[in-house]
């Protein structure tokens, strides 16, 4: 090896990271070798996993649009608007229950409410429900978009450090005083870990974001149809 090669300058930070990966090729060594840019990606991965778990728990069908809830609400109100206790229980049942309870409250507060008033209140409750269902999806989409860019940033920074350390030794190549091409290639491969990790974070985040968006859209469509049917039922109670 040339006297000016990488191994003869262990004090330079990029080379210490290279040595760590050579001697202990486990996940921790990869993280250490990749440098500080990988830590924002690790934070994104932890946050993304937490958001996915939270959305899976919150978007269960039983918590959003229970199968028989609309039929039960219509049944208990065949002879008139039910009492406050029943309305409160309906509201606490699910997100759809909150929308249906708003219709009962509108008719209870104003027995002569017009069709427009009933629909306006149901639509307002529906918009609040939509905001609740879409919560955190924007953050998940941001992680899916930002993770590849963070990975690319880490790779660029790592390559700058590698080429900078090569240049400090008097150039690259196999000429006397030049850098070691094998070590250069190894350093570039380590820098690319950031890009790979960024894609590992971004691809699942994008998949789950698309999945949750489709699930929310299905829920909103079911709630819209249920609200239309419920509005017609409330109109019969008003007469």
What are these regions (language model features)?
Residues 64-153, 157-176, 208-239:
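Predominantly long cytosolic amphipathic alpha-helical stalk/bundle segments
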Residues 7-33, 170-180:
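Short, strongly hydrophobic alpha-helical membrane anchors
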Residues 21-70:
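Hydrophobic membrane-targeting segments
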Residues 38-51, 141-154, 201-205:
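Alpha-helical transmembrane segments of integral membrane proteins
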Residues 35, 49, 84-85, 100, ...:
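Residue-level signature of catalytic and energy-coupling elements of molecular machines
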Residues 182-209, 213:
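Pore-lining and gate-forming transmembrane alpha-helices of multi-pass membrane transport proteins
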């Amino acid at each position: 090896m040339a006297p000016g090669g990488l191994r003869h300058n262990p004090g330079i930070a990029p080379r210490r990271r290279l040595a760590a990966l050579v001697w202990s090729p486990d996940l921790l060594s990869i993280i250490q070798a990749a440098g500080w840019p990988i830590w924002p990606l690790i934070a994104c991965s932890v946050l993304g996993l937490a958001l996915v778990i939270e959305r899976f728990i919150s978007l269960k069908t039983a918590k959003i649009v229970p199968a028989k809830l609309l039929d039960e609400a219509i049944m208990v109100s065949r002879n008139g608007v039910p009492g406050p206790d029943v309305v409160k229980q309906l509201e606490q049942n699910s997100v759809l229950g909150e929308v249906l309870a708003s219709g009962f409250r509108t008719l209870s507060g104003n027995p002569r409410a017009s069709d427009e008033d009933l629909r306006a209140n149901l639509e307002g409750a529906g918009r609040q429900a939509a905001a609740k269902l879409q919560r955190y999806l924007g953050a998940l989409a941001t992680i899916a978009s930002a993770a590849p860019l963070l990975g690319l940033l880490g790779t660029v920074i790592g390559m700058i450090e590698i080429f900078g350390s090569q240049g400090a030794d008097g150039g690259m190549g196999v000429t006397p005083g030049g850098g070691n091409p094998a070590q250069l290639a190894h350093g570039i491969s380590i820098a690319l870990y950031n890009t790979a990790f960024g894609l590992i974070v971004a691809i699942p985040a994008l998949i789950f974001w698309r999945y949750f968006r489709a699930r929310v859209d299905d829920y909103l469509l079911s709630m819209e149809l249920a609200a239309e049917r419920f509005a017609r039922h409330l109109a019969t109670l008003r007469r």
